């Protein structure tokens, strides 16, 4: 019995380490993806709506083996409109994010998009009727205060483009809320397949409306790389959550901030201002507090 307990204790930490490693690798892949996306939209001036289409279109192609394994039968659902709404919101979030990367430095964009959990809390209270205690409201207020410090709306240099990462956080938060409402009544495979199948045509429609652009030469190669990085990063996320509890691996997702700051400095020479770290500290602290609070709530007996 003693040997079995020791074996069990040895296995659990190893799974936790593997989960953390996959999450860090996902963060690195997303950081490189953001560099490629910003290079395409900012340096090469490729239209952002078309950029979103090509990036996720190629990601869809790279995801076809996964989709084939699941089969289109996984799309069977009693809630098609709910799925359609969440994917439309996710697609609009992608459009806002890519347009944001075309206009603002990576470090600012990634810090602001990390406000998404706070929009989820607001939405959970308003639309799902979840109870939100004073501590969670305080954490949400702290997170938005951090975002305001980074945005500096009182500055003369603030432009509408700086709000795009916040808009993407709002849209992705709304999409996550609908996903949350589906997790108890739908299979994970169904939720995943609907996203994979619908995201590309929706992005395609938005690209056509904005003036469709076709990449060639080196630009096409960069979009292939962006699609591959998107598929790989999402796959690494799946492996992370499969290896260990989400509550354990989620804090490692916050490493995306320093990883993106480093990537922005290496490839674009961005040197973030000191106020970034103050605002980011508020956002990170509030996010970690909310996560720990959620863990305690889930562990309470019904």
Swiss-Prot record:
State the source organism's domain of life.
Answer: Bacteria
Q: Where primarily located?
A: membrane
According to its UniProt record, where is this protein located? Cell membrane
Record membrane topology: Multi-pass membrane protein
Output a single Gene Ontology CC term carried by this record.
plasma membrane
Q: Which UniProt keywords apply?
A: Cell membrane, Membrane, Repeat, Transmembrane, Transmembrane helix, Transport
The answer, when asked if Membrane is one of the entry's keywords, is yes
Ranges annotated as spanning the membrane: 16-36, 44-64, 87-107, 109-129, 158-178, 191-213, 227-247, 264-284
Tell me what induces its expression. Answer: Negatively regulated by riboflavin, probably via an FMN riboswitch.
- Domain (EamA) ranges: 30-151, 170-291
- InterPro entries from the UniProt entry: EamA_dom
Matches recorded under PANTHER family: ACYL-MALONYL CONDENSING ENZYME-RELATED, SOLUTE CARRIER FAMILY 35 MEMBER G1
Describe the family membership recorded for this protein in Swiss-Prot or TrEMBL: Belongs to the drug/metabolite transporter (DMT) superfamily. 10 TMS drug/metabolite exporter (DME) (TC 2.A.7.3) family.
What functional role does this protein have? Transports riboflavin into the cell. Can also transport FMN and FAD. Required for normal nodule development during colonization of pea plant roots.
What is the protein's name according to its record?
Riboflavin transporter
Species source reads Rhizobium johnstonii (strain DSM 114642 / LMG 32736 / 3841)
């Amino acid at each position: 019995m003693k040997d079995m307990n020791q074996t069990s204790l040895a296995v659990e930490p190893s799974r936790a380490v593997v989960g953390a490693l996959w999450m860090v690798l996902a963060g690195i892949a997303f950081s490189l993806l953001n560099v490629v996306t910003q290079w395409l939209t900012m340096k090469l001036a490729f239209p952002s709506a078309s950029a979103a289409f090509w990036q996720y279109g190629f990601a869809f192609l790279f995801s076809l083996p996964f989709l084939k394994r699941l089969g289109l039968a996984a799309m069977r659902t009693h809630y098609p409109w709910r799925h359609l709404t969440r994917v439309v919101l996710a697609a609009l979030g992608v459009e806002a994010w890519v347009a944001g990367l075309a206009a603002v430095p990576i470090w600012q964009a990634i810090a602001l998009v990390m406000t998404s959990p706070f929009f989820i809390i607001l939405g959970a209270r308003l639309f799902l009727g979840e109870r939100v205690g004073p501590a969670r409201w305080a954490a949400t207020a702290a997170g938005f205060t951090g975002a305001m410090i980074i945005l500096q709306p009182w500055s003369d240099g603030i432009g509408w483009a700086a709000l795009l990462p916040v808009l993407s956080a709002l849209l992705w938060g709304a999409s996550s809320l609908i996903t949350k409402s589906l997790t108890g009544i739908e299979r994970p495979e169904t939720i995943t397949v609907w996203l994979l199948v619908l995201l590309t045509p929706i992005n395609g429609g938005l690209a056509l409306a904005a003036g469709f652009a076709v990449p060639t030469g080196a630009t096409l190669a960069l979009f292939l790389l962006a699609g591959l990085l998107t598929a790989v990063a999402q796959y690494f996320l799946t492996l992370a959550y499969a290896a260990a509890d989400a509550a354990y691996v989620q804090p490692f997702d916050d490493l995306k901030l320093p990883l993106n700051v480093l990537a922005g400095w290496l490839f674009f020479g961005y040197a973030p201002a000191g106020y970034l770290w103050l605002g980011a500290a508020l956002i990170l602290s509030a996010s970690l507090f909310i996560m720990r609070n959620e863990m305690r709530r889930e562990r309470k007996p019904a």
